[in-house]
């Protein structure tokens, strides 16, 4: 009989549960609990347990750090693929328009014969797949805000390949988005709170999350059934609020399905778990609702307003849902929480500058020339003020006049 191993906190100790063990030869073993008995007190046993606990803690920390880096790479890769896909598809559509084919906006489907458009579509598919996989390795608090990088990459590539002008506001917005993303990566949660479907099920049964889900569902139904038919065409926040509220459930479902796929790769019988099918149904329903109302928002209101507002609302709801469901913030220090929020708000400002002023044609040379003109006019006004002040000081006062006339009389 080998050394006894103590399960880490949070792992269930019950018959039939499968757990992972890291072996000394850099391999991994899967063990199934077949018998549960009471622990007998023994000094030697406690020594072995402490040794095992230390080894498990070290291996768990290494695995968590590795998973975080994998999730980060997948999230950034997703943004690159998705941001590039917009440029590739737009380039393909422009080539078709230059050849005289019917445009897609006019009901044409000739883009299906354009290879560049298909490359863009495949790039978007690869980006969505990478984003899906990122949720299985990294916290949603980190993965979701990094989606702003796709907007940044699309804006930069469009200025080079589509000859679209990127003004000074857009460049500042890109810099702020990069800085905000970097800050969020530095202060992101380092450990995953949910690593198995069993843990996911326990989190979903938490009273706090159940209350949150009920409140979100009620608000969404009120917006869909009552508010949207009356105010949807005049208030931009109605459609975007529906997309954002439902989006919290879609990201949570993606997170759970990502964990299920990871366990399936590890040859665990996840298909027997009913939670997988529940998460899949919630994902399909929430994504369908999101696409429907996001299309309504884009068709009704200006895209430059819809995009930044939707990003802020959607990301805020995802971060809130992650804090309640996965409790990713509980293990973070106050400095990391402040850093994460600061990075998020910096990204918001960058996205706002990138979209809100994209039609404003202002260059850096115009700003510098305007500043020089203001400085010159300010100097002229100061010189006039000094000249008037000197004239006033040099003019004879009333007392001087009295003294002058009195001397004359003498």
Swiss-Prot record:
GO:BP terms for this protein?
Answer: magnesium ion transport
- Give the GO cellular component terms, alphabetically: Golgi apparatus; Golgi membrane; membrane
Q: Which domain of life is it from?
A: Eukaryota
Glycosylation is annotated at 25, 35, 50, 55
The annotated topology with respect to the bilayer is: Multi-pass membrane protein
Keyword Amino-acid biosynthesis carried by entry: no
Transmembrane regions listed in the UniProt entry:
68-88, 115-135, 137-157, 166-186, 208-228, 234-254, 274-294, 306-326, 337-357
What is this protein's tissue specificity according to the annotation? Expressed in the pancreatic islets.
* Extracellular compartment spans: 1-67, 136, 187-207, 255-273, 327-336
Q: List where in the cell it is found.
A: Golgi apparatus membrane
User: Which keywords, in A-to-Z order, does the entry hold?
Assistant: Glycoprotein, Golgi apparatus, Ion transport, Magnesium, Membrane, Transmembrane, Transmembrane helix, Transport
GO MF terms here are: magnesium ion transmembrane transporter activity
The task this protein performs is described as: Acts as a Mg(2+) transporter. Can also transport other divalent cations such as Fe(2+), Sr(2+), Ba(2+), Mn(2+), Cu(2+) and Co(2+) but to a much less extent than Mg(2+).
Designated name of the protein = Magnesium transporter NIPA3
Give the organism, scientific name. Homo sapiens
User: What is the taxonomic lineage of the source species?
Assistant: Eukaryota, Metazoa, Chordata, Craniata, Vertebrata
